[in-house]
Amino acid sequence: MNRWVMSYLALALRREGFAVQTLSYRTMRGTLAEHLARVAERIAALEAPRLHLVGHSLGGVIALRYLQRRADPRVRRAVLLGSPVAGCRAAADLARSSGGELLLGGSLGVWREPVDVSVDPRFEVGAIAGTVAFGLGRMVTRLPKPNDGVVCLDETKFPALRDHLALPVGHTLMLASPQIARQTAAFLRNGEFRR
Protein backbone atom coordinates (compact mmCIF):
# COMPACT_ATOMS: atom_id res chain seq x y z
CA MET A 1 0.00 0.00 0.00
CA ASN A 2 1.32 3.40 -0.92
CA ARG A 3 1.76 5.65 2.08
CA TRP A 4 -0.19 8.42 0.33
CA VAL A 5 -3.36 6.41 0.91
CA MET A 6 -2.97 7.34 4.57
CA SER A 7 -2.58 11.08 3.82
CA TYR A 8 -5.92 12.25 5.21
CA LEU A 9 -5.58 10.21 8.40
CA ALA A 10 -1.97 11.33 8.84
CA LEU A 11 -2.98 14.99 8.45
CA ALA A 12 -5.87 14.59 10.90
CA LEU A 13 -3.58 12.97 13.48
CA ARG A 14 -1.02 15.74 13.03
CA ARG A 15 -3.78 18.26 13.73
CA GLU A 16 -4.51 16.32 16.93
CA GLY A 17 -0.88 16.89 17.99
CA PHE A 18 0.76 13.63 16.91
CA ALA A 19 4.02 13.44 14.97
CA VAL A 20 3.23 11.04 12.12
CA GLN A 21 5.41 8.87 9.90
CA THR A 22 3.90 6.77 7.12
CA LEU A 23 5.33 3.68 5.49
CA SER A 24 4.63 2.21 2.07
CA TYR A 25 4.71 -1.53 1.50
CA ARG A 26 4.18 -3.73 -1.53
CA THR A 27 1.07 -5.73 -0.79
CA MET A 28 1.42 -7.99 -3.80
CA ARG A 29 5.20 -8.39 -3.81
CA GLY A 30 6.48 -8.36 -0.27
CA THR A 31 6.13 -11.18 2.20
CA LEU A 32 5.09 -10.73 5.81
CA ALA A 33 8.71 -11.24 6.92
CA GLU A 34 9.87 -8.50 4.54
CA HIS A 35 7.18 -6.11 5.73
CA LEU A 36 8.04 -6.81 9.38
CA ALA A 37 11.75 -6.20 8.73
CA ARG A 38 10.99 -2.83 7.10
CA VAL A 39 8.69 -1.78 9.93
CA ALA A 40 11.28 -2.78 12.55
CA GLU A 41 14.03 -0.92 10.70
CA ARG A 42 11.91 2.21 10.34
CA ILE A 43 10.81 2.19 13.98
CA ALA A 44 14.36 1.64 15.24
CA ALA A 45 15.45 4.78 13.36
CA LEU A 46 12.83 6.99 15.03
CA GLU A 47 13.99 9.24 17.85
CA ALA A 48 10.97 9.38 20.10
CA PRO A 49 10.47 8.19 23.68
CA ARG A 50 7.01 6.76 22.95
CA LEU A 51 5.57 5.31 19.75
CA HIS A 52 2.14 4.18 18.56
CA LEU A 53 1.16 2.21 15.47
CA VAL A 54 -1.85 2.66 13.19
CA GLY A 55 -2.50 0.20 10.39
CA HIS A 56 -5.29 -0.26 7.88
CA SER A 57 -6.34 -3.69 6.57
CA LEU A 58 -3.16 -5.72 5.93
CA GLY A 59 -1.21 -2.87 7.56
CA GLY A 60 -3.02 -3.59 10.83
CA VAL A 61 -2.19 -7.28 10.53
CA ILE A 62 1.46 -6.31 10.00
CA ALA A 63 1.30 -4.02 13.07
CA LEU A 64 -0.12 -6.83 15.21
CA ARG A 65 2.51 -9.31 14.00
CA TYR A 66 5.17 -6.69 14.76
CA LEU A 67 3.89 -6.41 18.35
CA GLN A 68 3.94 -10.20 18.66
CA ARG A 69 7.40 -10.81 17.24
CA ARG A 70 9.79 -7.93 17.56
CA ALA A 71 8.28 -4.87 19.12
CA ASP A 72 10.40 -1.95 20.18
CA PRO A 73 9.82 -1.30 23.92
CA ARG A 74 8.86 2.32 23.13
CA VAL A 75 5.69 1.15 21.35
CA ARG A 76 2.69 1.56 23.64
CA ARG A 77 -0.53 1.48 21.62
CA ALA A 78 -1.81 0.35 18.25
CA VAL A 79 -5.03 1.01 16.35
CA LEU A 80 -6.07 -1.51 13.71
CA LEU A 81 -8.49 -0.16 11.09
CA GLY A 82 -10.53 -2.71 9.18
CA SER A 83 -7.83 -5.30 9.83
CA PRO A 84 -8.76 -8.97 9.47
CA VAL A 85 -6.60 -10.20 12.36
CA ALA A 86 -8.76 -13.27 12.93
CA GLY A 87 -8.66 -14.47 9.32
CA CYS A 88 -10.18 -13.07 6.15
CA ARG A 89 -12.97 -14.87 4.31
CA ALA A 90 -12.65 -12.64 1.26
CA ALA A 91 -8.89 -13.32 0.92
CA ALA A 92 -9.34 -17.05 1.56
CA ASP A 93 -12.05 -17.28 -1.10
CA LEU A 94 -10.01 -15.17 -3.51
CA ALA A 95 -6.98 -17.45 -2.99
CA ARG A 96 -9.10 -20.45 -4.03
CA SER A 97 -10.38 -18.75 -7.18
CA SER A 98 -8.76 -18.76 -10.60
CA GLY A 99 -5.95 -16.20 -10.54
CA GLY A 100 -6.53 -15.42 -6.88
CA GLU A 101 -3.04 -16.41 -5.79
CA LEU A 102 -1.61 -14.04 -8.39
CA LEU A 103 -3.80 -11.18 -7.16
CA LEU A 104 -2.88 -11.74 -3.51
CA GLY A 105 0.81 -12.04 -4.34
CA GLY A 106 3.19 -11.88 -1.39
CA SER A 107 0.38 -11.33 1.09
CA LEU A 108 -0.96 -14.82 0.37
CA GLY A 109 1.22 -16.25 3.16
CA VAL A 110 -0.45 -13.97 5.70
CA TRP A 111 -3.82 -15.53 4.99
CA ARG A 112 -2.43 -19.08 5.04
CA GLU A 113 -0.64 -18.71 8.39
CA PRO A 114 -2.37 -20.06 11.46
CA VAL A 115 -4.14 -17.18 13.16
CA ASP A 116 -2.29 -15.95 16.24
CA VAL A 117 -4.12 -13.20 18.07
CA SER A 118 -2.09 -13.21 21.27
CA VAL A 119 -0.41 -9.98 22.27
CA ASP A 120 1.68 -8.99 25.27
CA PRO A 121 -0.54 -7.12 27.78
CA ARG A 122 1.93 -4.23 27.92
CA PHE A 123 0.61 -3.20 24.48
CA GLU A 124 -2.82 -1.60 24.30
CA VAL A 125 -4.51 -2.53 21.04
CA GLY A 126 -7.77 -1.08 19.74
CA ALA A 127 -9.62 -2.04 16.58
CA ILE A 128 -12.17 -0.21 14.49
CA ALA A 129 -14.40 -2.14 12.10
CA GLY A 130 -16.59 -0.77 9.35
CA THR A 131 -20.20 -1.84 8.90
CA VAL A 132 -21.04 -0.39 5.47
CA ALA A 133 -20.72 -3.26 2.99
CA PHE A 134 -18.94 -1.35 0.25
CA GLY A 135 -15.73 -2.87 -1.06
CA LEU A 136 -14.09 -5.30 -3.47
CA GLY A 137 -14.63 -8.30 -1.19
CA ARG A 138 -18.26 -8.35 -2.26
CA MET A 139 -17.14 -9.15 -5.81
CA VAL A 140 -15.19 -12.19 -4.63
CA THR A 141 -17.51 -13.81 -2.14
CA ARG A 142 -20.71 -13.43 -0.19
CA LEU A 143 -19.74 -11.96 3.17
CA PRO A 144 -21.89 -12.34 6.27
CA LYS A 145 -23.10 -9.07 7.74
CA PRO A 146 -21.96 -6.90 9.29
CA ASN A 147 -18.94 -6.25 7.09
CA ASP A 148 -17.17 -3.30 5.48
CA GLY A 149 -17.25 -4.76 1.97
CA VAL A 150 -13.94 -6.60 2.46
CA VAL A 151 -13.59 -7.57 6.12
CA CYS A 152 -16.30 -9.01 8.38
CA LEU A 153 -16.84 -7.48 11.80
CA ASP A 154 -15.97 -10.74 13.59
CA GLU A 155 -12.63 -10.89 11.72
CA THR A 156 -11.53 -7.69 13.47
CA LYS A 157 -12.01 -8.98 17.02
CA PHE A 158 -9.77 -10.97 19.33
CA PRO A 159 -9.66 -11.46 23.12
CA ALA A 160 -6.54 -9.36 23.79
CA LEU A 161 -8.11 -6.19 22.38
CA ARG A 162 -8.29 -3.34 24.85
CA ASP A 163 -11.22 -1.80 22.95
CA HIS A 164 -13.26 -2.43 19.80
CA LEU A 165 -15.54 -0.07 17.91
CA ALA A 166 -17.83 -0.58 14.91
CA LEU A 167 -18.62 2.48 12.79
CA PRO A 168 -20.76 3.00 9.67
CA VAL A 169 -17.96 3.22 7.08
CA GLY A 170 -16.74 1.07 4.21
CA HIS A 171 -13.32 -0.57 4.05
CA THR A 172 -11.46 1.92 1.88
CA LEU A 173 -13.41 5.02 2.86
CA MET A 174 -12.49 4.63 6.53
CA LEU A 175 -9.14 6.21 5.66
CA ALA A 176 -10.94 9.44 4.71
CA SER A 177 -13.38 9.46 7.63
CA PRO A 178 -13.17 12.30 10.17
CA GLN A 179 -14.91 10.03 12.69
CA ILE A 180 -12.26 7.32 12.25
CA ALA A 181 -9.52 9.94 12.65
CA ARG A 182 -11.06 11.30 15.88
CA GLN A 183 -11.52 7.82 17.34
CA THR A 184 -7.97 6.82 16.38
CA ALA A 185 -6.60 9.90 18.14
CA ALA A 186 -8.76 9.19 21.20
CA PHE A 187 -7.39 5.66 21.52
CA LEU A 188 -3.79 6.75 20.99
CA ARG A 189 -4.24 9.35 23.75
CA ASN A 190 -6.31 7.42 26.28
CA GLY A 191 -6.21 3.71 25.42
CA GLU A 192 -9.94 3.66 24.67
CA PHE A 193 -12.36 4.91 22.07
CA ARG A 194 -14.74 7.78 22.75
CA ARG A 195 -18.32 6.64 23.40
Predicted regions and their residues:
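C-terminal catalytic-base region of ester-bond hydrolases, centering on the histidine
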Residues: D120-R195
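Serine-dependent carboxylesterase/thioesterase catalytic core
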Residues: M1-Y8, A12-L23, G30-R122, L143, ...
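Histidine-bearing beta->alpha loop at or near hydrolase active sites
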Residues: Y25-G30, P168-T172
